[in-house]
């Protein structure tokens, strides 16, 4: 019994990469399910004004951990697709971009196979996820005064840690959205994107200093996620710790599905917040643009 328990908590090898691992069977039994908490998306007067939402996905699956192993990750499908479902039903179409223009990488082991809402929005946007735009190629349009985008959405999943927080393109985009009073939507590990405006800047000039957010707790990444074999080793760096160093205030200590709006920044704490954040984002954008 003890040996079976230990084995089920051992990360599963991913043979597509040297020394790479998926989450353990036990961790997936705790963290994933066939259905989400989706309970409807009722937007009787959807937006029809033409503004869209730009979703920035991760184009990298592997994170090099402190012990030399590779974590096989990507974007979490629920964190991406449930907010997309709500916003799409509210009338906001999505464009999809990655840093390289290569396909968005999803944690398919977390896909809720019996959730019709998630499956339907995945099918609708699969062509864009497989062939996204390169962020640099649409950046000038995205930051322009007549930008077609009402908001930018950065879903979570540990894959966000690879590239997006260090991207000069993401830095310019977020700075422009702040300056032009547009919306930024992100959850779980997605708020790692908020580190981009600090690239090559003095900490005292950080534009999100004093903002309150929800984000996946560092304590889980340094504790339970290692203990149950969700990750094969310690992360190279921690999202919350680095945001707090820059003056961001983290509201949540656990993962309960908490969401929060601070000015034009909408955040959620974990996959459990996906449905709530989708509702908050849809309601917020409809109030702002459906006039």
From Swiss-Prot:
Q: Where are the compositionally biased (Basic and acidic residues) regions?
A: 1-18
Q: Name one GO cellular component term.
A: cytoplasm
Any one GO biological process:
methylglyoxal catabolic process to D-lactate via S-lactoyl-glutathione
Q: Cross-referenced InterPro entries, in alphabetical order? A: Class_I_gatase-like, DJ-1/PfpI, HchA, Prot/Nucl_acid_deglycase
Question: What's its top-level EC category?
Answer: hydrolase
> What are the record keywords, sorted?
Cytoplasm, DNA damage, DNA repair, Hydrolase, Stress response
Please state the protein's primary subcellular location.
Answer: cytoplasm
Q: Which residues are responsible for catalysis?
A: 188
Which Enzyme Commission number(s) are listed? 3.1.2.-, 3.5.1.-, 3.5.1.124
Q: Which GO terms describe its molecular function?
A: glyoxalase III activity; protein deglycase activity; thiolester hydrolase activity
Per the record, which residues fall in region Disordered? 1-24
Catalytically driven reaction(s): N(omega)-(1-hydroxy-2-oxopropyl)-L-arginyl-[protein] + H2O = lactate + L-arginyl-[protein] + H(+); N(6)-(1-hydroxy-2-oxopropyl)-L-lysyl-[protein] + H2O = lactate + L-lysyl-[protein] + H(+); S-(1-hydroxy-2-oxopropyl)-L-cysteinyl-[protein] + H2O = lactate + L-cysteinyl-[protein] + H(+); N(omega)-(1-hydroxy-2-oxoethyl)-L-arginyl-[protein] + H2O = L-arginyl-[protein] + glycolate + H(+)
State the compartments where it is located: Cytoplasm
What does this gene product do?
Answer: Protein and nucleotide deglycase that catalyzes the deglycation of the Maillard adducts formed between amino groups of proteins or nucleotides and reactive carbonyl groups of glyoxals. Thus, functions as a protein deglycase that repairs methylglyoxal- and glyoxal-glycated proteins, and releases repaired proteins and lactate or glycolate, respectively. Deglycates cysteine, arginine and lysine residues in proteins, and thus reactivates these proteins by reversing glycation by glyoxals.
Q: Cross-referenced NCBIfam families, in alphabetical order? A: PRK04155.1 (NF003168)
Q: What family is this? A: Belongs to the peptidase C56 family. HchA subfamily.
Q: Can you say what this protein is called?
A: Protein/nucleic acid deglycase HchA
- Give the species this sequence originates from: Pseudomonas aeruginosa (strain UCBPP-PA14)
